[in-house]
């Protein structure tokens, strides 16, 4: 069994000294500005105004996002309980908050210090480890690494620091001792420690206003009140445990996040995030624990919750317990992380979202359409795409209005569906100006405005973690540049052969027909080469008798074209 002696108290928070976080420097506004949501008072912090209105679960409405320190915002994210593979329900929440984090950083200039707790000891971990006949520590280590690999595959930025529960047991014990010392928790003869919910009076329930009932309580429970929740669990036979003042045991779930977040950020937290299913009882209990320990009126200023991912046509969320989930690894065998991220962008982070293959295919086609538009825009800039006169002034105005609309939507609780609509609208107008024409343009060409649109699209999608280049070129170890050059040369050679074969012979009559007949094998060879490259995922577009362009296909489109 794992054992450890008690360590020192919480001590100085890990990152406070370096980043100026924690209680110091934070104060209530003059007159304690308060807003009430759902009957609760919310104390508006002072500090740096980000320019963003965010839906705060503490008030049930949008509030101005104000972070305590100009240099960095403090953000605690509930991490995984590492006992199995992560699934798309987890992915949806982490990708949505990753998008928000990127937007705050890159659009609104708000640096973020993010801490994520890893629950690496838990009833589920112990049960699964026993089933697999391995130690809980080995199981947790295996699936923690698996989780991190999945997040990297989805392009979710890692937190500033991961903190494991098992590596912070002394700090958790000290946190529990602090709550007991303040009269809000009690130990029992069996070695358990519980939070005394009645000791909070009407202060409990700031987040959702629900008091837990006695549902599912064992007959031999040693709680004073059925609604009390565990801070420390006495060890059961054959379970992992740590030494404590109350006997061998391990932490309860809720206390882990409270202690870890406080260890880094102290008594004041800007942002706390998680799935909506964590709001109660987990986040509610975190608030109660932290406000007791720190003796403060408001520990976390903003609670952000993401909606559930549902299997289409199902009311229940995607979860392991319901066995209705798709693992991230299985999903990525069919669709790219960019497609999933775009799928997430199309709905509010707070809303429930239905998963289906058709929804993913629609997201994929929209993303491919954007990539195709950028390819056409580049072809136009290179003089490879002939089209009629371009309404340049209109496109400049559309670009300007799109930028304004996108910034306004992002500042309005990260309204990404509005952003996607604005982006697709600009692409639609741009495509409308790039319709191929056999006629020479009546006015001068206007490549600069398309260059500006390309630059804006690439900048925006890079901001939210999507690579539009991957819709055209291969990503990977740097070999795409070489591949790009080789295919460019091949397409240029084919283009010259095709141009020669299609050129009208100067001869007439039988001589002319003979020349055309002689050139037919060249055209057939060009078509054969195009089909062969399509089978390898390279699609050549003949835009006229003199110009051709190419793009890389995703696997599904490649299979469809090859079958056709």
From Swiss-Prot:
Motif 'HIGH' region, chain ranges: 80-90
Short sequence motif named 'KMSKS' region, residue ranges: 317-321
Cofactors named for this entry: Zn(2+)
Identification of the protein by name: Probable cysteine--tRNA ligase, mitochondrial
Phylogenetic lineage: Eukaryota, Metazoa, Chordata, Craniata, Vertebrata
GO CC annotations, alphabetized: cytoplasm; mitochondrion
Function summary: Mitochondrial cysteine-specific aminoacyl-tRNA synthetase that catalyzes the ATP-dependent ligation of cysteine to tRNA(Cys).
Cofactor note text: Binds 1 zinc ion per subunit.
Binding site for Zn(2+): 78, 257, 282, 286
């Amino acid at each position: 069994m794992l054992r450890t002696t008690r360590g020192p108290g919480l001590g100085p928070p890990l990152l406070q000294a370096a980043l100026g976080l924690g209680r110091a420097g934070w104060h209530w506004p003059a007159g304690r500005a308060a807003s009430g949501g759902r009957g609760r008072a919310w104390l508006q912090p002072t500090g740096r105004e980000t320019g963003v209105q965010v839906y705060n679960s503490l008030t049930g409405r949008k509030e101005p996002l104000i972070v305590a320190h100009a240099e960095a915002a403090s953000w605690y994210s509930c991490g995984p309980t590492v006992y199995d593979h992560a699934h798309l329900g987890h992915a949806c929440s982490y990708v949505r908050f990753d998008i928000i984090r990127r937007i705050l950083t890159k659009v609104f200039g708000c640096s973020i210090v993010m801490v994520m707790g890893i629950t690496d000891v838990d009833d589920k971990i112990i049960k699964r480890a026993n089933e697999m006949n391995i130690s809980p520590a080995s199981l947790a280590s295996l699936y923690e690494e698996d989780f991190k690999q999945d997040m990297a595959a989805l392009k979710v930025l890692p937190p500033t620091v991961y903190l494991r529960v098992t590596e912070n047991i002394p700090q958790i014990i000290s946190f529990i001792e602090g709550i007991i010392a303040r009269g809000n928790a009690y130990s029992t003869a069996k070695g358990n420690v519980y939070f005394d919910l009645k000791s909070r009076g009407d202060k409990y329930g700031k987040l959702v206003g629900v008091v837990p009932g006695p549902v599912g309580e064992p007959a031999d429970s040693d709680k004073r009140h059925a609604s009390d929740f565990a801070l420390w669990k006495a060890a059961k036979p054959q379970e992992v445990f740590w030494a404590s003042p109350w006997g061998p045991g391990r932490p309860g779930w809720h206390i882990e996040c409270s202690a870890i977040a406080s260890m880094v950020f102290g008594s004041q937290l800007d942002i706390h995030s998680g799935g909506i299913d964590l709001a109660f009882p987990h986040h509610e209990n975190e608030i109660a624990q932290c406000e007791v320990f720190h003796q403060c009126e408001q520990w976390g200023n903003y609670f952000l919750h993401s909606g559930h991912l549902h299997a289409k046509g199902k009311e229940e969320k995607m979860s392991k317990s319901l066995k209705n989930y798709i693992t991230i690894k299985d999903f990525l065998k069919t669709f790219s992380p960019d497609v999933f991220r775009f799928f997430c962008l199309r709905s509010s982070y707070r809303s429930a979202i239905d998963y289906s293959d058709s929804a993913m295919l629609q997201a994929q086609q929209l993303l491919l359409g954007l990539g195709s538009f950028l390819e056409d825009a580049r072809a136009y800039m290179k003089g490879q795409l002939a089209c009629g006169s371009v309404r340049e002034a209109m496109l400049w105005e559309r670009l300007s209005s799109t930028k304004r609309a996108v910034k306004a939507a992002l500042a309005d609780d990260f309204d990404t569906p509005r952003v996607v609509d604005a982006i697709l609208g600009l692409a639609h107008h741009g495509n409308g100006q790039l319709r191929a024409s056999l006629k020479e343009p009546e006015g001068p060409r206007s490549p600069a405005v398309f260059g500006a649109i390309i630059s804006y699209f690439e900048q925006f999608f890079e901001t939210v973690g999507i690579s539009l280049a991957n819709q055209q070129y291969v990503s990977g170890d740097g070999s795409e540049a070489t591949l790009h050059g080789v295919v460019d040369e091949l397409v240029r050679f084919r283009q010259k052969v095709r141009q020669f074969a299609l050129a009208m012979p100067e001869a007439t009559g039988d001589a002319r027909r003979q020349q055309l007949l002689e050139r037919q094998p060249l055209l057939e060879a060009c078509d054969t080469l195009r089909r062969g490259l399509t089978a390898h995922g390279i699609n050549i577009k003949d835009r006229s008798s003199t110009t051709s362009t190419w793009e890389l296909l995703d696997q599904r489109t490649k299979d469809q074209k090859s079958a056709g």
